[in-house]
């Protein structure tokens, strides 16, 4: 269940959104957080955008990510911040032709893939460094 947060609040036996879905969390500390789900979800306490033939969902997702800080600034409420669909209305988005939306989304998705590979490599390198530090700084492995 997606309930206004960066992580699923809990799991639900059924879904109310099928196919790919963009969510914008509606309340709480993560109000305004934008996410894309590729599997069926049970969405609650969030605005959702589903796939359509009139726009590229990945493009919409990247548009929203690009405006993430603006969306956060649109929060209302005090101790319990909220973002409602009407709060997003003043935020301007540009939509080129569908083929261009698709091309832009493909480039950005490919870059995300490259970044994920680099992030994995970075984590592996960090783990290797930690292991080397343990070996070298404890004296188990000597260099001279």
Across the structure, where does each feature detected by a protein language model lie?
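Generic non-transmembrane alpha-helical segments
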Residues: 67-70, 111
């Amino acid at each position: 269940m997606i309930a206004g947060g960066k992580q699923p609040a809990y799991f639900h036996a059924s879904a109310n959104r099928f196919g790919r879905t963009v969510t914008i969390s509606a309340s709480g500390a993560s109000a305004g957080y934008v996410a894309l789900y590729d599997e069926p979800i049970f969405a609650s306490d969030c605005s959702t955008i589903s796939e359509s033939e009139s726009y590229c969902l990945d493009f919409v997702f990247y548009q929203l990510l690009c405006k993430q800080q603006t969306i956060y600034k649109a929060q209302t409420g005090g101790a319990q911040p909220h973002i409602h669909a009407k709060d997003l209305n003043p935020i301007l988005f540009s939509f080129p032709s569908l083929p261009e939306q698709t091309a832009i989304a493909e480039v950005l998705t490919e870059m995300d893939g490259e970044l994920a590979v680099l992030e994995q490599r970075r984590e592996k390198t960090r783990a290797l460094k930690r292991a080397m530090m343990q070996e070298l700084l404890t004296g188990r492995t000597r260099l001279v």
